[in-house]
């Protein structure tokens, strides 16, 4: 028993310094990587730092993360509310990126539903939800672009005659009207509406015709 305790004690006595050195090496490596990242970020902001202590690295990192958190909060607030301060090009780009990803995901869901043997009530509800949310995103993006355009017009001289920066997207009322037609959901698989992704920054809007009867037809939105 004494021999076993002695071996355990000796093992801990030897391993503890080794583990401590490994832990310190990991900390130092992370601090070095963090220093390189912070120096690069500061240089992008116009600040030049030649030497940083470990405490300085941690302080700068905390400040930088707080700034990122505030910016992210403002962007999220603009996405959710869609009102308040004029949206920046960054927040508008975030909304556009999310909308494009949503359209792509909705297209994949549509393809799966179209491949099913029959269209049930659940499928129609899913398609209705997707189209309603897509129209909301489209309206939200248009509102933010209008606010951004008004804000830019106030910031530049009236004699310039054009905006300093082009707006993202390029969507107009016609696209919103085309999106609204997407909410007209019917009762058969052939009448389910396909949502496709956007090509570039513009949403192509076209109307296609589908019918259950030989003489009946109604427009649906197929943006490809």
From Swiss-Prot:
Residues 205-224 are annotated as: Disordered. Its main location: nucleus. Residues 11-68 form the bHLH domain. Transmembrane segments: none annotated. SUPFAM superfamilies: HLH, helix-loop-helix DNA-binding domain. CDD domains: bHLH-O_ESMB_like. Coiled coil: none annotated. Residues 205-215 have a biased composition (Polar residues). It holds the Pfam family HLH. Changing residue 83 to F: In strain: NVIII-m11. A motif (WRPW motif) lies at residues 221-224. Residues 98-130 form the Orange domain. Keywords: Coiled coil, Developmental protein, Differentiation, DNA-binding, Neurogenesis, Notch signaling pathway, Nucleus, Transcription, Transcription regulation. It is found in: Nucleus. Changing residue 151 to Q: In strain: NVIII-m11. One of its GO terms (cellular component) is nucleus. InterPro entries: bHLH_dom, HES_HEY, HLH_DNA-bd_sf, Orange_dom. GO terms for biological process: cell differentiation; nervous system development; Notch signaling pathway; positive regulation of neuroblast proliferation; regulation of DNA-templated transcription; regulation of neurogenesis. Has a particular type of basic domain (presence of a helix-interrupting proline) that binds to the N-box (CACNAG), rather than the canonical E-box (CANNTG). The C-terminal WRPW motif is a transcriptional repression domain necessary for the interaction with Groucho, a transcriptional corepressor recruited to specific target DNA by Hairy-related proteins. Transcription repression requires formation of a complex with a corepressor protein (Groucho). PANTHER family: BASIC HELIX-LOOP-HELIX TRANSCRIPTION FACTOR, HES-RELATED. This is Enhancer of split m3 protein. It comes from Drosophila melanogaster (Fruit fly).
